[in-house]
């Protein structure tokens, strides 16, 4: 079975996970989306999928757009430093 069938967000309005902006009301929307992610049994799979498929917008796997960008930068620096 595909991990998406187990995702808690399937029963939520998809708009919740795609806030416009990253300040003011969008911050509250991001926090609400993360609350859904916190209840989800497939957060790890979701985040991995988002990173592997280049999902640049929205909340995926409990991480906002900015958080995923920061994670990608950290991973790239680690890879450059260690050669792994």
From Swiss-Prot:
Consequence when changing residue 57 to E: Still binds DNA
Source organism superkingdom: Bacteria
Record PTM text: Can be nitrosylated by NO, 8 NO react per cluster leading to the formation of 2 dinitrosyliron thiol complexes (DNIC). These complexes are quite stable in the presence of air.
GO cellular component: cytoplasm
Location in or out of the cell: Cytoplasm
Note describing how the cofactor binds: Binds 1 [4Fe-4S] cluster per subunit. This cluster is stable to O(2) but very reactive to nitric oxide (NO). Following nitrosylation of the [4Fe-4S] cluster binds 1 [4Fe-8(NO)] cluster per subunit.
Molecular function GO terms recorded: 4 iron, 4 sulfur cluster binding; dinitrosyl-iron complex binding; DNA binding; metal ion binding; protein-disulfide reductase [NAD(P)H] activity; protein-disulfide reductase activity
Effect of residue 62 to E: Loss of DNA-binding, still binds 4Fe-4S cluster
InterPro entries: 4FE4S_WBL, Whib
Keywords: 4Fe-4S, Cytoplasm, Disulfide bond, DNA-binding, Iron, Iron-sulfur, Metal-binding, Transcription, Transcription regulation
Protein family according to the UniProt entry: Belongs to the WhiB family.
Name by which UniProt lists this protein: Transcriptional regulator WhiB1
């Amino acid at each position: 079975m595909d991990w998406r069938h187990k995702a808690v967000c399937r029963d939520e309005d998809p708009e919740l996970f795609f806030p416009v902006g990253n300040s003011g009301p969008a911050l509250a929307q991001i926090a609400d989306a993360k609350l859904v992610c916190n209840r989800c049994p497939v957060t790890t799979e979701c985040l991995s999928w988002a990173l592997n498929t280049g999902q640049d917008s929205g909340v995926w796997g409990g991480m906002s757009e900015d958080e995923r960008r920061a994670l990608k930068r950290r991973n790239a620096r680690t890879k450059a430093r260690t050669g792994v």
